[in-house]
Amino acid sequence: MLFVCMLIVWITYCIFPCGFVRAEGQTKYSKDFFDTVEPIKMRDPLAVVLGAMDKGEVFAFTYADAVKFAGHSCPAVAGAYKSTQMALRALYGDEIPVRGNIKVSFKGDVDYKVNGPISQVVTLITGAAPESGFKGFGTAGKYGRYNLMTFDRDHAPDPKATCSIVFQRVDNGKKTEVTYYVEFVPASERMDKLIPLVLSGKASEDESKEF
C-alpha cells in the first residue's frame, strides 16, 4: 500500500514539476438554487488511503455536483440526488455515511425508464458501481466498488413510479427502499410548448431561459 501511495505522489510531481496550480474560476450556473440545496457528506476510506484527503475529512457532494455531472438539472437528476440523500439518512441516521460501504439495487434493468441516468448520480455520491467499477486491492478486492450496483430485471417497480432503489449497508446489512414518483413534482403547463421550441433551436432567448 505504501508503494501505491509513493507511486501516486511520484506521478503527481512528474505532471506538476513546478508545484500545484489551482484551477481558476468557478462554474457559473443560471440557477442560484443549485448551490443552496443541502449537501451530502460522505466519508471515503479509499480517498484517505490513497492520499486524496486527510483522515477525518469528508467529501461534500452538492446538487451542483450532480448537475455538473449530468450536464443539466431535471426531475430525474433532482430525484436521484434527493432519493440518495433520504436513503443515506435512513441507513446512517446522524452518522456520516461511508462511501463504498453501500450496495445499490435498482428494480428493473438499466434501460428501464430513467434507471440509467439516475444510477449515475447515485454512483457519484455513494461510490457504488456496476461491473465497470474499481475492483479494489489484492485478491480480496479491498476498497472495491465493483458490482456494488446491480439492476434487477426480474422485478420491475410500480408502473407509475419513476424508479425504485434498494440501498443496503455492506457492514451490517441494514437496508431501505426508496421509490420516486416524478408525477408528484409540480409541472409547468408551459413545458409542452417550450420543449419542441428548445429542441428544434427555434426558441427565443427568453423562452430558453424560461425552459
Please name every model-derived segment.
Residues 18-22:
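Sec/Tat signal peptide C-region and signal peptidase I cleavage site
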Residues 24-71, 82-211:
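Non-transmembrane, aqueous-exposed alpha-helical and coiled segments at domain scale
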